[in-house]
């Protein structure tokens, strides 16, 4: 079983990190389009063009499934991708539906492209949460992640300044609508009230992958990983610091 995971950069490693724990015997290919990151500030047409090129590259590797581990790419291009390729393509979207039972309001943080896209507004409408959902674009956070700047005072100030625009006493759930944002769960946790939960779309996406594979998640004894970047070949030593941080962040909710 060969599964490709695609993101504009290192955000999708949060999905790969969890997939390595949930699957066995899978040959994973992680493709990062670092050359064109970030996607979140680009036009929809540009994102579609980039995604079509990347998915074409991955289909040439004879993969059995492609996972778009990028909310921005899913929002802008998933329809075009599925109509252009026969390989199963799993998208990723903000876990807004988990806010149905939230006692207070919901704050969704994502890239500008995801926030302004029809897919998110349609999703919020579908679960009837328009009246209690607030949206906040955090474009700088993707750049911080790509530069491995996770714990600086500049990051914390940026998040405090942006999130303080809302009455946090009313927010019962923060939805991370960008996989890059998973690297900053500790900073979000430090800013938000203890009662405010933090969720992302990783587990929901992996559950969808397993459903698409007929409920099967074990295909052999060991997983393998091949890292590919549009700028250079990635090696494990470059990836390990990200995965170690994600192991810590996954415990924060």
UniProtKB/Swiss-Prot annotation:
**Per UniProt, what is one Pfam family of this protein?**
Asp_Glu_race
Can you name one GO molecular function term for this protein?
glutamate racemase activity
The reactions it catalyses are: L-glutamate = D-glutamate
Database matches in Gene3D superfamilies: 3.40.50.1860
| Top-tier EC class | isomerase
Keyword set, alphabetical order: Cell shape, Cell wall biogenesis/degradation, Isomerase, Peptidoglycan synthesis
Listed pathway(s):
Cell wall biogenesis; peptidoglycan biosynthesis
Alphabetical list of SUPFAM superfamilies matching this protein: Aspartate/glutamate racemase
Indicate yes or no for the key word rRNA-binding: no
Biological process, per Gene Ontology: cell wall organization; peptidoglycan biosynthetic process; regulation of cell shape
Where along this sequence does the record place binding of substrate?
A: 7-8, 39-40, 71-72, 179-180
Active-site residues annotated for this sequence: 70 (proton donor/acceptor), 178 (proton donor/acceptor)
What PANTHER family does this protein map onto?
GLUTAMATE RACEMASE
**NCBIfam families the UniProt entry points to:** glut_race
Q: Which family does it belong to?
A: Belongs to the aspartate/glutamate racemases family.
In its UniProt entry, what is this protein called? Answer: Glutamate racemase
Organism of origin is Campylobacter fetus subsp. fetus (strain 82-40)
């Amino acid at each position: 079983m060969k599964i490709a995971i695609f993101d504009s950069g290192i955000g999708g490693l949060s999905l790969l990190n969890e997939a390595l724990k949930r699957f066995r015997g899978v040959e994973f290919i992680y493709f990062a389009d670092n050359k064109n990151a970030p996607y979140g500030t680009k036009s929809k047409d540009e994102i579609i063009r980039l995604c079509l090129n990347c998915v074409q590259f991955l289909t040439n590797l004879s993969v059995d499934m492609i996972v778009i581990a990028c909310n921005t790419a899913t929002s802008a291009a998933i329809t075009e991708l599925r109509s252009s390729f026969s390989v199963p393509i799993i998208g990723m979207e903000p876990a807004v539906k988990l806010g149905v039972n939230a006692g207070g309001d919901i704050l969704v943080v994502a890239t500008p492209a995801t926030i302004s896209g029809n897919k998110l507004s349609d999703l919020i409408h579908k679960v009837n949460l328009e009246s209690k959902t607030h949206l906040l674009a955090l474009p700088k956070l993707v750049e911080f992640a790509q530069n491995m700047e996770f714990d600086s005072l500049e990051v914390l100030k940026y998040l405090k300044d942006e999130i303080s625009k809302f009455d946090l006493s009313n927010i019962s759930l923060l939805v991370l609508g960008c996989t890059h944002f998973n690297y900053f769960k500790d900073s979000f946790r430090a800013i938000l009230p203890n009662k405010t939960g933090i969720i992302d779309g990783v587990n929901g996406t992996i559950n969808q992958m397993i459903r698409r594979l007929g409920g099967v998640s074990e295909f052999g004894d060991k997983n393998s990983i091949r890292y590919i970047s549009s700028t250079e070949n990635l090696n494990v030593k470059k990836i390990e610091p990200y995965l170690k941080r994600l192991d810590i962040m996954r415990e924060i909710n």
